[in-house]
Amino acid sequence: MRHTNDELAQNVAERWCWEVTHRDDTRVARRLSCQQEVDGVYRLDEGAVLDDFFHLLDQIGVMAVLAEARGTAMQREMVPYVQDVLLYGLKTRFGIERMNALPALLFSDAALMPLVGFKAQHVRQGVCQRGAATRQGERTPGPISPAILAHHIVKLNVWDLECVFNGAIRAWAKAGVFSPQVTGMADGTDLETTERYTGCGQVTRTVRLEDTWGTGHEIAVTVYGWKVLLLLAAVTKMPLAVQVGQSQEHEALWARALVTQARMHLAGYARLSQVFCERGFMEGTTRWWLDQQGIRLVVPAKTNMAVTAEAHAHAAAGEDLTVGRRVHTVRHGQGRTAWTERVATEVVGMTGLTTYDHYGTPEHKRHANRRDFQAHRINAVVVRKWQGQDQGPAGKTVFLTNAPVEQPLPPFEDDDNRSLIEHCCSKEAKQPWDLGHPPQKTERAVRVHVLFTLRLFALATAYRLPCEREATGREPVGWQRWRRQLLEQTRELVIVFAQDYDGIFHLAEYSLLVGVKRKDRPPGIGTRQDVLAKYRLMSRH
């Protein structure tokens, strides 16, 4: 929904105060007009990024669950554990990569710290004075040290974290964020680390490199780290399920777990009806299991499979095929040098392929060499023309599907959405959401960080997209542009803290309240008398 600057300010100040400050513009304005001392005056630009998001989480019960979060093996707490979670949430939300950068970029921000429960005194002196007498050099600003935050957040119970965010995704489903029929896209991405991370996996891969003369060379490269498996909703690009495995583990081991987790989140409010994935992500037994669950799938076939050769032969023969064609205009270049091209796409669909022996239960697969073996039938879509390239009657790329192929273009076009995963989630999470920098170099830290980051990304995405559509009616914009839009709306606002209260004012209003005469006043900002009347204050001469 579209908000005024006053409403945005109200949301930022009121909804993020962790039982520390209370919104009272009139009380704070009175102190300003009387020239009384206040605790601090800060810009509100960073707080604008938070906006209604965390208020909505509070409404659906997520904040209450976070308040009950506990770390494992925590003997005592000088700071409520929820404040550690909120601090780490701010780090994740603002994309701060390194823990050591927190004092300069976050902990020293006196405008944000009161919003998560720390007062200005905590920012300057910390919550604990232990060791202050023996400290050499200046104290690092902030309520706690980055090492303490990392130590506490890693002790977060992974099962509790799963329950918190899984319940939140179900709440979004209940609110109608998803359509009744949801299409899922499954893919995996590497989270590379060094060998110094305890518990990391390792895998050796062959990489082909070319020298300056164009000669190719193959070298073996060992990669350390983990593998993040995702199942996204195709329309919202919201992660429905997340699994973390070691880098050497195959994606197929996690396919059923992803689908089961996503179906659990949507149960009662929506249905996972289709799944698209890359080659090798799902083996034949998993594809058969999806078929028995009533879930349609589209997956590219490997070139060395017998069913791929059978599909090429059927396409070349041209018998019992359904043909789909599409021609669209593609624009190239910019300005005067721009030119357009008509690009044709042609695909053919076929049914009843019988050479996919692994398409069935594990018991069915073991009988593949028996004389009385009967393979389960599967459909296919073969691409003959794509992006202006003619692959001949037999085609090149083959997609296996259990969906109807009377119209072969829809399965082919739907598979194109799979390529959006790297741009809409994996790259977004790795770059602005900082997926690749866990707080510690341990397996537990990596798992907590990945789950925390992707679940927060999922919740924020589910909140952002409906707001954009309602406010602008345009296509959704990326996270970075959306952040810039929020910053633009609140760049001229300041937040004033006075004892246990805070107030949000336009910079021009603040200037007039403290007695500064301004020749240039923005539209909508009257004289000092008008500002005093707005806050129901008597004029003081």
Task: Go through each PLM region and give its residues.
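An anionic, glycine-rich sequence signature occurring as long contiguous blocks
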Residues: 4, 12, 296-420, 536-541
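Electropositive, glycine- and tryptophan-enriched low-complexity nucleic-acid-binding patches
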Residues: 209-268, 382-398, 402
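Short, solvent-exposed helix-loop connector elements
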Residues: 68-76, 407-417, 431-448, 467-468
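Active-site-proximal, Lys/Arg-enriched surface segment
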Residues: 141, 146-230
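Charged, often Cys/His-bearing segments associated with DNA-binding zinc-finger transcription factors
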Residues: 1-56, 530-533
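Short, conserved catalytic/metal-binding motifs centered on acidic residues
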Residues: 87-88, 102-103, 145, 149, ...
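Basic, short loop/linker segments at the boundary and entry of helix-turn-helix/winged-helix-like folds
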Residues: 40-88
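Basic, amphipathic alpha-helical segments enriched in Lys/Arg and hydrophobic/aromatic residues
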Residues: 434-495
